[in-house]
Design a protein with these regions (language model features):
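ADP-ribose/adenylate-binding Rossmann-like module
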Residues: 12-75
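Short, flexible, glycine/charge-rich loop motifs used to bind or transfer phosphoryl groups or to couple energy/partner
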Residues: 3, 31-32, 112
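Adenosine-phosphate binding glycine-rich loop
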Residues: 47, 52-133
């Protein structure tokens, strides 16, 4: 119910949910699309991975097509990252740099601050112990 409420209020919805080896889950139903404001956009990054290779996180998504249904534009591009490779690389590099600033102090020494929520959540091993699987 909360997702439906948020979708109805949104101008843009970007869905990315995929489960390896299974069809993409339906997160945005046709009824939810009908509730959206005219001119809204859904970018379905799970396009072509729905049941029987049709749809994505929204069953109205058409693989490798941009279509308008119920006044809402649905983008079903299956290779969107390749279209923005330079931007995606720059964004990734910036995120890595920002993370490194959290774990390397001004003297260039590795410093793991477990009080920092981001650092703590990213710590996989410590002192020979696996912290997360």
């Amino acid at each position: 119910a909360e997702v439906a409420k948020r979708v109805a209020q949104a101008d843009v919805v970007i869905s990315t949910a995929l489960i390896p080896g299974r069809a993409a889950p339906v997160l945005v139903t046709e009824e939810m699309v009908k509730s959206m404001k005219p001119g809204s956009v859904i970018v379905d990054l799970a396009a072509g991975k729905g049941a029987n290779g049709v749809g994505g996180n929204c069953p109205l998504t058409e693989t490798d097509q941009t279509v308008v249904k119920h006044g809402v534009t649905l983008v079903g591009d299956t290779n969107l990252p390749a279209r923005v490779a330079a931007d995606a690389s720059a964004l990734y590099a910036r995120n890595v740099l920002d993370f490194l600033k959290l774990v390397v102090n001004k003297e260039g020494v590795l410093h793991i601050d477990l009080e920092d929520d981001i650092v703590a959540a990213c710590l996989m091993t410590q002192g020979g112990e696996v912290k997360r699987k």
